[in-house]
């Protein structure tokens, strides 16, 4: 079992590493490519677009051909794209490389969640996804620090060679450690079960909405945090870095505690707790009389996301034993596109950073609480499949 957990964790971590590691080198990249930092900030959106594009096909291919045939090309593409970015001499080539990086990371991301659905029952999957969420929270803190240390001695291209090295490690794991977990092709007797695994299932759609809103909350916070903390609250850059590190610490602590909480409380209780924390955070930020109270509200955001997201993802994948790849892709596309659409619309309409965050917190909590309370799981399916090793 440990091989599946190690491989799944490694496959997922390419996604945040690709986002966060290069940011520290952005000024130097812009200078070398004769582009402005503002022009290269679009590299974040291009990367997410690549991920979304990969998710359009990766899930279906993973369900038809297997998890390894998607993970291996995905990791290989991430390696090639990282090298391509390091060799880019224009901003156009650099952005093209970032899109290809997103494609590779998206393939790996989809496969990771499908593997966990294949190999773990509901309760263990919820615990593992909570742990995975905690580990993922480490990357936004460690990746820029690692990038800074690398750039003390080496040029910015070394950041992408480091990402390529990470991709090589994932490729080796996918080739030699990961065993195929895709359930055997359905027989005629399995057709009714396969047909019943509809993406239009009310319970699945409710969890898609809940997880998409939750990701929108956390990405809105990440995107608005420089404005909130440095411009509105007046913290210095060093203080900002310290606060963000502390919020990551809160996220990790809660994520690592959630598996123990699942041994005591029902998953539904933790999901309700998550949304209550979001609602409390929104109200706290709306009426905050001081910076200290506002910072407390921010910690509630991190705690709320960490306690509920892994559980909600596990519930979303639960109904799918034969179409786990497609379900994972659908979740990923909804989360990436939904959160990006909200942030873009809020900026176009002219909603300020503070109100943008408060608005999504309150909307997420109210909508999600209603869905949790009124949309119950349907008929249970097999919790996980026996692992079949394919030649």
UniProtKB/Swiss-Prot annotation:
It comes from Escherichia coli O17:K52:H18 (strain UMN026 / ExPEC). Gene3D superfamilies: Multidrug resistance protein D. One of its GO terms (molecular function) is transmembrane transporter activity. HAMAP family: MFS_MdtL (MF_01530). GO terms for cellular component: plasma membrane. PROSITE patterns: MFS. The chain crosses the membrane at residues 4-24, 42-62, 69-89, 93-113, 131-151, 158-178, 203-222, 245-265, 269-289, 293-313, 331-351, 356-376. The lineage of its organism: Bacteria, Pseudomonadati, Pseudomonadota, Gammaproteobacteria, Enterobacterales. Confers resistance to chloramphenicol. InterPro entries: MFS (IPR011701), MFS_dom (IPR020846), MFS_Efflux_Transporters (IPR050189), MFS_trans_sf (IPR036259), Multidrug-R_MdtL (IPR023697). It is a multi-pass membrane protein. The gene is mdtL. This is Multidrug resistance protein MdtL. It is found in: Cell inner membrane. The keyword Cell membrane applies. SUPFAM superfamilies: MFS general substrate transporter. GO terms for biological process: response to antibiotic. It holds the Pfam family MFS_1.
